[in-house]
Curated annotation (Swiss-Prot):
InterPro entries: Acyl-CoA_DH_CS (IPR006089), Acyl-CoA_Oxase/DH_mid-dom (IPR006091), Acyl-CoA_Oxase/DH_mid-dom_sf (IPR046373), AcylCo_DH-like_C (IPR036250), AcylCo_DH/oxidase_C (IPR009075), AcylCoA_DH/ox_N (IPR013786), AcylCoA_DH/ox_N_sf (IPR037069), AcylCoA_DH/oxidase_NM_dom_sf (IPR009100)
Protein name stated in the entry: Isovaleryl-CoA dehydrogenase, mitochondrial
Variant or mutagenesis effect after changing E286D: Residual isovaleryl-CoA dehydrogenase activity
Pathway: Amino-acid degradation; L-leucine degradation; (S)-3-hydroxy-3-methylglutaryl-CoA from 3-isovaleryl-CoA: step 1/3
Quaternary structure (record): Homotetramer.
Annotated residues for binding of FAD: 165-174, 198-200, 312, 323, 380-384, 409-411
Annotated function: Catalyzes the conversion of isovaleryl-CoA/3-methylbutanoyl-CoA to 3-methylbut-2-enoyl-CoA as an intermediate step in the leucine (Leu) catabolic pathway. To a lesser extent, is also able to catalyze the oxidation of other saturated short-chain acyl-CoA thioesters as pentanoyl-CoA, hexenoyl-CoA and butenoyl-CoA.
Localization of this protein: Mitochondrion matrix
Effect caused by changing E286G: Loss of isovaleryl-CoA dehydrogenase activity. Does not affect isovaleryl-CoA dehydrogenase activity
PROSITE patterns, alphabetized: ACYL_COA_DH_1, ACYL_COA_DH_2
Cofactor requirements of the protein: FAD
Amino acid sequence: MAEMATATRLLGWRVASWRLRPPLAGFVSQRAHSLLPVDDAINGLSEEQRQLRQTMAKFLQEHLAPKAQEIDRSNEFKNLREFWKQLGNLGVLGITAPVQYGGSGLGYLEHVLVMEEISRASGAVGLSYGAHSNLCINQLVRNGNEAQKEKYLPKLISGEYIGALAMSEPNAGSDVVSMKLKAEKKGNHYILNGNKFWITNGPDADVLIVYAKTDLAAVPASRGITAFIVEKGMPGFSTSKKLDKLGMRGSNTCELIFEDCKIPAANILGHENKGVYVLMSGLDLERLVLAGGPLGLMQAVLDHTIPYLHVREAFGQKIGHFQLMQGKMADMYTRLMACRQYVYNVAKACDEGHCTAKDCAGVILYSAECATQVALDGIQCFGGNGYINDFPMGRFLRDAKLYEIGAGTSEVRRLVIGRAFNADFH
């Protein structure tokens, strides 16, 4: 508890210190969108957690939300690195990292809250944040040796570096252990050949955690996987042009190419041929933290839809007073609140040392599918305006759909849950 209090004060100090400084060039303050209140008494949050949400919401609605439509339209976040340093100053890039490396030493519930609020302002930037803070930083915290942590964490946590993680390949998505990227040991180095695909933050990343096959004959195949820390600029490593995606536009994604890429043996994360343990343990927490993304998108839909229903008129009255629209509001709200309770409680359990693959898969399965439905309902409430790109409703739908595919598809999540029950009766 004392460590938590210290970390909370540290984060509070960073927030206070940021307020004393003018924003970076290019971050012109704009009138924030009118937000619906979030009842965190019902959500069971502590006073410190409520303050964290309020601080992040204020900052993000002023400095990110007004840019979200343009980020989506252009598929580019022009001020990404400056914004990343602002997040670093706020202490949220390394929110679960130890204080000794510059982190805030907080828990997964706080991580989910920040993920939610960033996604509320911009789903795309929220996804990039999740890849950086959880897939990269948290994996280094949990699996890196002391030298690796001292070398990489401070710059990743400050926002000087951008991080990523690379598992998937063109023919190895859900079946990730069938990956073909090969790592051959030669002296004190490994030579990597192959490629990775659909890598979030790939075009921008300075540090990447990359999984490769070090034993092609291993049975089962999962026993021959090793995790490596790869730096931008290493000989033989390059990236292709960023992908033109349906949604999450501005969260840059690309193919990684390895052509006789020379990686020092000291850059193995964990142990040789034991990368599957790094991968699978990290996947549970990835699903948990990324579940904050659909929460933020659902809240954004409500932020825009509920006020609209009480401004738009038809048949001589505000359309929000029609019973069919009241039903839409009720459905959207209850889906969001049910998802929040599930996600927050699983996060609390993980903070207390009780983390299950079944429920980490469950929270993103349920919240992702609810987010898609809530976005569809929001479009319906907007009517013709919901189908026009001058309004953000289409963006919410396109962004929400990613969470039914990334971090393991909805189908794979159902398998994880079903197999967990089967194991109880084996």
